[in-house]
Curated annotation (Swiss-Prot):
SUPFAM superfamilies: Nucleoside phosphorylase/phosphoribosyltransferase catalytic domain, Nucleoside phosphorylase/phosphoribosyltransferase N-terminal domain. HAMAP family: TrpD. Its EC number is 2.4.2.18. The keyword Magnesium applies. Belongs to the anthranilate phosphoribosyltransferase family. InterPro entries: Anthranilate_Pribosyl_Tfrase, Glycosyl_Trfase_fam3, Glycosyl_Trfase_fam3_N_dom, Glycosyl_Trfase_fam3_N_dom_sf, Nuc_phospho_transferase. This is Anthranilate phosphoribosyltransferase. It catalyses: N-(5-phospho-beta-D-ribosyl)anthranilate + diphosphate = 5-phospho-alpha-D-ribose 1-diphosphate + anthranilate. One of its GO terms (molecular function) is magnesium ion binding. The lineage of its organism: Archaea, Methanobacteriati, Methanobacteriota, Methanomada group, Methanococci. GO terms for cellular component: cytosol.
Length: 321
């Protein structure tokens, strides 16, 4: 199959599923060759879906009921606060959230890094995650614990330090099989393909796949592209004005500790650029989860949760599990 990819021929869903399982038994050199060849060719919806389905089928199983996930693909090389972690905590004030995350590969603050910097403990086992969900409406699913078959592939990804199909796969391979999902991608071209792949993997009722002018988030300082899936596909663009928010700057972030501190500042009611960034993405997640009727409603719901102290209280609950 490597020659086929090098010749820029696309793989079918079935071939992609087979290739994923084959990579688990390949040498690191050949794994790197496949990953770079796929990335150079450009991945299709079928290839993403085939890999994602195989990744889910190889994962440690966990049943948390009907959950939402907020996750980005990473790989945008940005130095921003970890917005998806902030959003997941806000969202858990209203619905069950299974946050599928990992340590950083290309950014300054991966979700697992920031989660621990917030003083939260990553559940060791699926049973621990279930207890966390029962007590707090929130469970952090640390990807390496649920995808042990990828141990051989992770060192290759770390060594390559470039975007690969695995950056895309993480959000599609949540072992809790989320029914609702807001998923950030690292290029505009990916939004439709990832939305199609998500629908093919199965289990999704509603999803937003977002790209924000260089970020795998909705951006507060420009135009964002969204592909929405709710049984049908719709692609459109939004700006902060569609959320009732002013344009704001994206301030760089240099470490998980800094990210955690700035998240807590927002949760504590501080009004700054970070707040707009978080509110915009929280609104997207609340709309995706069918808690908010639209983005404007989502912003108001998120604001109230922060201003009433619900979000800080929720963070404290999660810390104390």
């Amino acid at each position: 199959m490597l020659n086929k990819i090098i010749e820029r021929e696309n793989l079918s869903f079935e071939e992609s599923y087979e290739l994923f399982n084959m990579l688990l038994n390949e040498s690191e050199m050949r794994i790197a060759a496949y990953l770079v060849a796929l990335q150079t060719k450009g991945v299709t919806a079928d290839e993403i879906a085939g890999f994602a389905k195989a990744m889910r089928d190889n994962a440690v199983k966990i049943d948390l009921g009907e959950v939402t996930d907020t996750c980005g693909t990473g790989g945008d090389g940005s130095k921003t606060i970890n917005v998806s972690t902030a959003v997941s905590i806000i969202l858990s004030c209203f619905t069950k959230v299974a946050k599928h995350g990992n340590v950083s590969i290309t950014s300054k603050s991966g979700s697992a890094n920031v989660y621990e910097a917030l003083g939260c403990k990553i559940p060791e086992t699926p049973d621990d995650a279930k207890k966390s969900m029962e007590k707090t409406n929130f469970a952090f699913l640390f990807a390496p614990k649920y995808h042990p078959t990828l141990k051989k592939i992770m060192p290759v990804r770390n060594e390559l330090k470039v975007k690969t199909i695995f950056n895309i796969l993480g959000p599609l391979a949540n072992p809790a099989n989320p029914k609702y999902q807001i998923l950030g991608v690292n290029s505009a071209e990916l939004s439709e393909n990832v939305a199609i792949a998500l629908s093919k993997v199965g289990g999704i009722k509603k999803a937003l796949v977002v790209y924000g002018n260089g970020l795998d988030e909705l951006t507060p300082n420009g135009t964002s592209k969204i592909t929405e899936y709710d049984g049908k596909f719709d692609t459109y663009e939004v700006t902060p004005k569609d959320f009732g928010l002013d344009y704001s700057k994206i301030r760089p972030c240099e470490s998980p500790d800094e990210s955690a501190k700035r998240l807590i500042d927002v949760f504590s009611g501080k009004i700054n650029d970070d707040r707009n960034f978080i509110l915009m993405n929280a609104a997207g997640a609340l709309y995706t989860s069918e808690i908010a009727s639209d983005f404007l409603d989502g912003v108001e719901i998120a604001k109230e949760a922060i201003e009433s102290g619900k979000v800080l209280k929720k963070l404290e609950e999660i810390r104390n599990v």
